[in-house]
Regions:
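Positively charged, small/polar-rich N-terminal and surface patches that mediate targeting and assembly
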Residues: 2-118
Length: 118
């Protein structure tokens, strides 16, 4: 609780985007005041289902494509604005632009101090 009585509702925004859009998305989030985030290199597929590449004259199907996963913990009231920011920076209009998930967060605990936000 903040201020003794206010309950802070937190959410986890998990965005999976094309790697080449990461720096653009990061900059857009920083401009909105987001400085803390976790990123992970992941592989995935959705509607895109993969691509066909040619290597040494042979065709190869790559069905799991590289993506970047961004995780941000935010207050509930910030979710809509940050989703719009991510979409605006990540969207190319082509299949494979990514996906955004929003999940509830029960608590955040700072390891160094043990301080807990609920």
């Amino acid at each position: 609780m903040a201020n003794g009585s206010e309950v802070i509702i937190m959410k986890l925004i998990k965005a999976i985007i094309k790697p080449e859009r990461f720096e653009i998305v990061k900059k857009a989030l920083e401009e909105k005041g987001v400085t803390s985030m976790t990123t992970t290199e992941v592989q995935g597929r959705g509607e895109q289902k993969g691509i066909t590449l040619e290597y040494r004259g042979k065709q190869m199907i790559v069905d799991m494509l590289p993506k970047i996963q961004i995780e941000i913990i935010v207050r509930d009231r910030e979710v809509d604005e940050l989703i719009a920011t991510i979409i605006g920076a990540a969207r190319t209009g082509r299949i494979g632009d990514g996906k955004i998930f929003v999940l509830p967060v029960d608590a955040a605990i700072r390891v160094r101090t043990g301080e807990m936000e609920r």
